[in-house]
């Protein structure tokens, strides 16, 4: 049992005679994506909330792709990759993930331009992960809502000093109406436990394919 938990050791002192053993758990930061994502997709197979929608077999994953994916489990792989991104870089939003999963759009004789990934796919995957309890919205702040006219412009009134002031929105009880803003999705405790357990389970495979990982 001890050998399974001892993953790193450090030599302390100039003579190297003192050795301190650090009992650590392999985390999502230690495993390459090409090994981690398929293993995480398999681990999430029992999550009923994570499943490919009916339209998933017809869509492209990004504007720079020419055809839909051919892998049968591409939705699970993409969802696993999104969960890994959230675990490593969260809180993140749909736009950041769309840029991360994008590529280069072929413009023919013109220079290539960045092509973002499908936001609809990413948004749906995040909603499924949220339903599964693996990610959550990270609260940022609340902002006051103000009245607008039929043209979408703010409604102003004069204060006692003659300055224009926006009219705050109120509910039926006269309470000020506010809207919560979120900085993106972050991983939950259950999601962190899942990704760390998957990372620990594939550490041996990762060290076999990438021998240099054993140094870290």
Enumerate the predicted regions with their spans:
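Residue-identity detector for glycine
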Residues: 13-16, 162
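Positively charged, polyanion-binding regions of nucleic-acid-associated proteins
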Residues: 74-91
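Basic amphipathic alpha-helical segments that dock to polyanions
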Residues: 97, 122-132
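A short, conserved structural fragment
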Residues: 130-144
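Short, amphipathic alpha-helical interaction segments positioned at domain boundaries
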Residues: 147-216
């Amino acid at each position: 049992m001890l050998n399974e938990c001892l993953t790193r050791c450090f030599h302390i002192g100039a003579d190297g005679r003192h050795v301190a053993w650090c009992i650590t758990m392999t985390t999502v930061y230690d495993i390459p994506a090409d090994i981690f994502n398929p293993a995480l997709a398999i681990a999430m197979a029992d999550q009923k909330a994570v499943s490919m929608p009916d339209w998933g077999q017809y869509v492209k994953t990004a504007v720079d792709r020419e055809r839909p994916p051919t892998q049968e489990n591409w939705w699970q792989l993409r969802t696993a990759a999104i969960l890994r991104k959230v675990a490593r870089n969260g809180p993140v939003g749909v736009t950041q993930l769309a840029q991360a999963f994008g590529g280069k759009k072929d413009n023919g004789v013109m220079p290539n331009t960045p092509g973002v990934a499908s936001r609809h796919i990413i948004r749906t995957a995040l909603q499924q992960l949220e339903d599964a309890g693996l990610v959550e919205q990270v609260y940022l702040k609340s902002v006051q809502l103000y009245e607008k006219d039929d043209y979408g412009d703010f409604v102003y009134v004069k204060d006692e000093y003659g300055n224009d002031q926006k009219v705050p929105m109120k509910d039926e009880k006269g309470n000020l109406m506010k809207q919560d803003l979120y900085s993106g999705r972050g991983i939950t405790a259950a999601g962190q436990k899942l990704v760390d357990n998957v990372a620990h389970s594939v550490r041996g495979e990762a060290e076999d394919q990438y021998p240099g990982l054993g140094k870290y």
